[in-house]
Amino acid sequence: MELRAFCVILLITVLAVSSQAAKNKKEKGKKGASDCTEWTWGSCIPNSKDCGAGTREGTCKEETRKLKCKIPCNWKKAFGADCKYKFENWGECNATTGQKVRSGTLKKALYNADCQQTVEATKPCSLKTKSKSKGKKGKGKE
């Protein structure tokens, strides 16, 4: 009987301590609400090299915050990582320049980034045309 009472008291104590710890953790996660509404955000600065995880600094009045951000490794540096564009299909190959061109219109500017309304991208013409892949041989009945 004493063992059962001890176990019940121990269980209640453990539950009380864990609920208090969860409450403290939840309150710790909340940051003081800011009355700033006009945040100005800088560009994402990668931690190493020129792409991957990084940080972005924002200011509002006298308050400064840092956010984690990520620069995709396939981004076009001329356009900026915070400018998202909708691109058309690649044009025909220009024989004189040896390049294909396509244009893109601004779809979204993240963090109030200063983006161009339209941009052009170029790439070298491919030397050989791609052929459609054929079905795999040897699979199935003959």
From Swiss-Prot:
From the record, give the cysteines joined by S-S bonds: 36-60, 44-69, 51-73, 83-115, 93-125
Q: Which residues form the signal peptide?
A: 1-20
> GO CC terms on record?
extracellular region
Where found in the cell? Secreted
BP term (GO), one: defense response to bacterium
Keywords linked to the UniProt accession: Antibiotic, Antimicrobial, Developmental protein, Disulfide bond, Growth factor, Heparin-binding, Mitogen, Secreted, Signal
Asked if the Swiss-Prot or TrEMBL record annotates the protein with the keyword Secreted, the reply is: yes
Q: What does this protein do?
A: Secreted protein that functions as a cytokine and growth factor and mediates its signal through cell-surface proteoglycan and non-proteoglycan receptors. Binds cell-surface proteoglycan receptors via their chondroitin sulfate (CS) groups. Thereby regulates many processes like inflammatory response, cell proliferation, cell adhesion, cell growth, cell survival, tissue regeneration, cell differentiation and cell migration. Inhibits mesoderm formation and promotes neural formation during development. Plays a role in development of the neuromuscular junction (NMJ).
What is the name attached to this protein's record? Midkine-A
